[in-house]
Regions:
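Two-component/phosphorelay signaling modules centered on CheY-like receiver
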Residues: 12-31
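Acidic catalytic/metal-coordinating carboxylates
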Residues: 35-38, 61-64
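Active-site residues of response regulator receiver
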Residues: 54
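The feature encodes the CheY-like receiver
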Residues: 58
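As written
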Residues: 62, 95-102
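Short amphipathic alpha-helix used as the core "switch/output" element in two-component signaling
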Residues: 63-76
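C-terminal output helix
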Residues: 90, 107-118
């Protein structure tokens, strides 16, 4: 069974490229969002196995959205992986304090990396 994924990023070019890459690698990208409101709605409606959330969403904070989605009740709840072009060390304390399963640099984004994180966190769907 393919892992279903929601990608949350305010860069539309990245959304297209990430969707294409992940779908070629066997991840089912069931939705994309560029704002927190879209992410919350998509998470409730689509119920992805995992949400990839950019740390820097312009005026919005990816950490706040991650907390909302990972801590959501019922259908809004999702497992979260934080993504960024920034180095993990730049946000190490904030990442450690977040409910996210892990952090992935955008340059390291792959289907295998996502499946590996989900496996280590308690099972791939």
């Amino acid at each position: 069974m393919a892992v279903s994924c929601l990608i949350v990023d305010d860069n539309h070019e990245f959304l297209r490229a990430a969707r294409d890459l992940l779908e070629r690698e066997g991840i089912s990208v069931i939705g994309v969002a560029s704002t927190g409101a879209q992410a919350r709605r998509s998470c409730r409606e689509l119920k992805p196995d995992v949400a990839l959330i950019d740390i820097d969403l312009g005026e919005e904070n990816g950490f706040d959205i991650a907390r909302e989605l990972a801590g959501g009740e019922g259908a809004a709840q999702a497992r979260v992986i934080l993504i960024s072009t920034y180095a993990e060390d730049d946000f190490a304390d904030m990442i450690a304090d977040s409910p996210a399963l892990s952090f992935l640099p955008k340059s390291g984004l792959s289907g295998a990396a996502i499946r590996g994180i989900l496996r280590r966190a308690g099972g791939e769907p």
